[in-house]
């Protein structure tokens, strides 16, 4: 990842794996997560490339879709006729207590919250967001993470049969997209590197603890730390805010 020349955008699988693992609850990911949501400058900030070169995603046509990412620990590809040997086994997924469908309201609510967490991370991070069709309303592939051979309901999003939960998730997704479009600071043409505008006394990005103090090296390295704040200030590099292609 990051080896293509300027003008190309690339699927950022490091973004996918880091974001999946972070929301699953894995420890020690704060430094890498900060890099991913700020445009993955460690991968793309070279040879004149821009933040949009990073295509940010957590799901694609290969692997679990969003609903199954929060509903299954393991792949269930028996319908493919290969004795579940096909498909990737390291999915960075979490079923939240029950494998597959459940009627438990607490688990269902937690899964919906996690879907929103993942969608918000994709759509509000620096880079080019990519969504998988059907994720916006919770389409399921029944745990199949290699559904290339399924010309049926496993692969067909049911646009006419969306549940109440699905409609709520779709509206949440719509509002996220509207938010991204409304605030150019979310799609700068320059990488966020903590550069400071001395005249205005502002920094393009500040990383904060839950107590709103600046993160220290020790806090970044704390394996038990699970959250931080990201403060963007559009005044730091006003001339660097532009749409792709401008």
Give the role of each language-model region:
Residues 1-133, 137, 146-150, 184-187, ...:
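Conserved alpha/beta catalytic core and glycan-binding cleft of carbohydrate-active enzymes
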Residues 49-51, 220-226, 243:
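A short catalytic or substrate-binding loop motif that flags glycine-/basic-rich loops and adjacent residues
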Residues 121, 156, 227-231:
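Conserved hydrophobic/aromatic beta-strand scaffold that supports enzyme active sites
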Residues 140:
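Short beta-strand/loop motif that positions the catalytic acidic residue
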Residues 148-159:
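Acyl/amide activation-and-transfer machinery of modular secondary-metabolite enzymes
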Residues 163-190:
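Aromatic- and carboxylate-lined catalytic core of secreted/periplasmic carbohydrate-active enzymes
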Residues 213-237:
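Charged, flexible boundary elements
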